[in-house]
């Protein structure tokens, strides 16, 4: 259940009854401090100003119309006109029971939408590197959350599978008489790529052949298409291994590469010209956008077709947005692409809107993210200054986690140890990223991410096992426990219950904003509240069976919420650590 939404509507109705306009914003927020209650309505200031009255006076009038009977035990006005709302323990107890009775922990499903999520997007014939990590795991957390909320999610892996480099690669493979590319490892392909590029730059005859091969590939010649398909196939087979290791839900079926949009490009250029949006400028087709100015303060020109007839990324992105609306019937499109691409996307979307390809009612959202930095504050690199391969990073995570868990569990069987090390190591890498606000750069630090203290995956995984251990000791009868009532008398019980019931609100924010760090912060806070509750409210040695069972149910909902929350992040939980 979404308590924030329930209270917002109640306060809004009371504000309207007190004379506020129908579109007033109650601004109900979770309270930052316990003394301010569970929720606080902060909307009186802005509305009172419009009405020409003191905020506190408006708050007093709102209170006369505010009916929170059965929801709040106390409502008070604080400061200049904040309304503090303290939830009723009986209300909390009832909704904890309801959450436990539901597989979804009482989380409602909003109106179903078709949402396209563009994420990961590696390049063909290159191995995935750390630069692909953020898009891949942040995008996947958004996908998992949206799917849990009941939306139809279309994963779009916008793979770089087209361009002049393919003529170069095919020419080099042919020269090396290695047309049987299917048996090659991607590491070989990377070497081939470097060698091919060297020849392309230094050997004009080879470069000319490569350019001819691009033309043949683009014209649909079957031999060259087959070679191209091999290159794509090898790459995506290798990438799938990485996705599976990362516990990411992408599959081969989600690949929607740049090549998909090629047939659309001539028609788009012709249509933009026919609509008067694109004009000829120095032999190229250009759209001038008033929204973007060049250094001289003139409308910026965005090239959609070069003088030689070639198309640009912008043209592909226009076609891509059009396809996602017209063919995939998207109600909303999310792009997990780094912040450096922001202006490029804004320009493409400005053209998309002007051309009427995607209506304003369908949001195109750039969920941009910052960079992953080393401890020196510079982009994360190998010691030699090279790009860190994602597979190498995951190997190191596994090795470090293996040492860590072996130290803590010297007698654990090898197969169990390996499984635990994988959950901890991969979880640590993912959680370290997901727990940071995606819009900022973050420092990659092995020691911090593998620590058992603080907002880390090992701490969260351990917190979950700690709650489970209570049940192992309790030797509970599931049926008896299900029938037992929840009774909330202690402050720490109430605080834990209220936080547990804010799970849906947290999911809603992640779904709306694409910010998994909000879920990480919620789960970390929840684990801390459980720790305080466990310390001050004895469970197994409670004063009565009634209190014991009630507290066990709070522990049970905590375990379920931690597991489900971590699952929406793609973080594996374990039963023992």
UniProtKB/Swiss-Prot annotation:
PROSITE patterns: AA_TRNA_LIGASE_I. The keyword Cell division does not apply. It comes from the Bacteria. PANTHER family: ARGININE--TRNA LIGASE, CYTOPLASMIC, ARGINYL-TRNA SYNTHETASE. NCBIfam families: argS. This is Arginine--tRNA ligase. GO terms for cellular component: cytoplasm. It catalyses: tRNA(Arg) + L-arginine + ATP = L-arginyl-tRNA(Arg) + AMP + diphosphate. The gene is argS. Transmembrane segments: none annotated. It comes from Escherichia coli O127:H6 (strain E2348/69 / EPEC). GO terms for biological process: arginyl-tRNA aminoacylation. The keyword Chloroplast does not apply. Gene3D superfamilies: Arginyl tRNA synthetase N-terminal domain, HUPs, Isoleucyl-tRNA Synthetase, Domain 1. A motif ('HIGH' region) lies at residues 122-132. Its EC number is 6.1.1.19. Belongs to the class-I aminoacyl-tRNA synthetase family.
């Amino acid at each position: 259940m979404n308590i924030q939404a329930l209270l917002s509507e109640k306060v809004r109705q009371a504000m309207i009854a007190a004379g506020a306009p129908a579109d007033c914003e109650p601004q109900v927020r979770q309270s930052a401090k316990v003394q301010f209650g569970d929720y606080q309505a902060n909307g009186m200031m802005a509305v009172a100003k419009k009405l020409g009255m003191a905020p506190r006076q408006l708050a007093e009038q709102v209170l006369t119309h505010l009916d929170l009977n059965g929801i709040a035990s106390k409502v008070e006005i604080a400061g200049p006109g904040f309304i503090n709302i303290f939830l009723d323990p009986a209300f909390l107890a009832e909704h904890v029971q309801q959450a436990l009775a539901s597989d979804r922990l009482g989380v409602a499903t909003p109106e179903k939408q078709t949402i396209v999520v563009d994420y990961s997007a590696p390049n063909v014939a290159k191995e995935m590197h750390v630069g692909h990590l953020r898009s891949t795991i942040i995008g996947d957390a958004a996908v998992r959350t949206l799917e849990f909320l009941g939306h139809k999610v279309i994963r779009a892996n916008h793979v770089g599978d087209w361009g002049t480099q393919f003529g170069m690669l095919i020419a080099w493979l042919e020269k090396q008489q290695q047309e049987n590319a299917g048996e090659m490892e991607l590491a070989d392909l990377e070497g081939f790529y470097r060698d091919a590029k060297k020849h392309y730059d230094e050997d004009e005859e080879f470069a000319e052949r490569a350019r001819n091969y691009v033309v043949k590939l683009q014209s649909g010649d079957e031999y060259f298409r087959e070679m191209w398909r091999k290159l794509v196939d090898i790459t995506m087979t290798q990438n799938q291994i990485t996705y599976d290791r990362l516990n990411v839900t992408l599959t081969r079926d989600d690949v929607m590469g740049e090549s998909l949009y090629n047939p659309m490009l001539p028609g788009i250029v012709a249509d933009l010209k026919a609509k008067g949006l694109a004009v000829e400028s120095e032999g190229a087709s250009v759209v001038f956008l008033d929204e973007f100015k060049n250094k001289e303060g003139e409308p910026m020109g965005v090239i959609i077709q070069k003088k030689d007839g070639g198309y640009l990324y912008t043209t592909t992105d226009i076609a891509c947005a059009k396809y996602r609306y017209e063919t995939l019937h998207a109600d909303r499109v999310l792009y997990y692409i780094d912040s450096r691409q922001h202006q490029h996307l804004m320009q493409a979307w400005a053209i998309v809107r002007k051309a009427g390809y995607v209506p304003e009612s369908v949001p195109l959202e750039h969920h941009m993210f910052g960079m992953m930095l080393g401890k020196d504050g510079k982009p994360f690199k190998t010691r030699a200054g090279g790009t860190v391969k994602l597979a190498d990073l995951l190997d190191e995570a596994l090795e470090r986690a293996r040492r860590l868990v072996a130290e803590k569990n010297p007698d654990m069987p090898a197969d169990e140890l390996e499984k635990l090390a994988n959950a901890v190591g991969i979880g640590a890498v993912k959680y370290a990223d997901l727990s940071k606000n995606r819009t900022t750069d973050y420092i990659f630090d092995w020691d911090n991410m593998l620590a058992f203290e603080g907002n880390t995956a090992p701490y969260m995984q351990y917190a979950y096992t700690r709650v489970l251990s209570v049940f192992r000791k309790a030797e509970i009868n599931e049926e008896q426990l299900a029938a037992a009532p929840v009774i909330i008398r202690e402050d720490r019980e109430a605080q834990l219950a209220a936080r547990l019931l804010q799970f849906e609100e947290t999911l809603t924010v992640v779904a709306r904003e694409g910010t998994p760090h909000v879920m990480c912060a919620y789960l970390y806070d929840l684990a801390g509240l459980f720790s305080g509750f466990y310390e001050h409210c004895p469970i197994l040695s409670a004063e009565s069976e009634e209190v014991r069972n009630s507290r066990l149910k709070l522990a049970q909902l905590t375990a379920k919420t931690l597991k489900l929350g971590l699952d929406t992040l793609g973080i594996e939980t374990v039963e023992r650590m």
